[in-house]
Amino acid sequence: MARLRHIAVVVKDLDRAAEFYSKVFEFKRIGREDLDIGSAIYMSDGVINMALLNFRGKEGTKASDLKEGSTFVGAHHFGIQVDDLAETQKKIEAAGGKFFFDLGDERHGNFERKFKDPDGAIFDISKHGWQGTDGYTKK
């Protein structure tokens, strides 16, 4: 079976985004790459590789050819399973993240709390995880 091991998120400020995900979720910086079309900082929780991308959009590069490459921010959203929702929310907000809304019913285990990072990229946190994922717990 294929396994998801990589997600890429376009951000406005690489260092600020890397600091946010490192401070809140303890993701480790595992590399940086600077290319003609832009730069990336690679983070990991030990299983998933998260690429934080920033496209320069210089004339004649692939990013400028895509038009939205230099202005697009974020994937639609991604989710991170945590041990303590309230404690994680405090860390998110202290690091500059903003609460967005709650989705689902906590009594049935399909609950997630949505936030926006400092660049506006949307992400969820969940104590119980998501169906089909390692570590998912159904109430």
Where would I find each of the regions flagged by the language model?
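N-terminal beta-strand motif that seeds the catalytic metal site of vicinal oxygen chelate
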Residues: 1-18, 75-80, 126-139
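Vicinal oxygen chelate
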Residues: 3-12, 41-44, 64-139
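Short beta-strand
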Residues: 31-34, 76, 104
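Acetyl-CoA-dependent GNAT
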Residues: 54-58, 127-130
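A short, polar/proline- and glycine-enriched secondary-structure boundary/capping micro-motif
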Residues: 61-65, 134-137
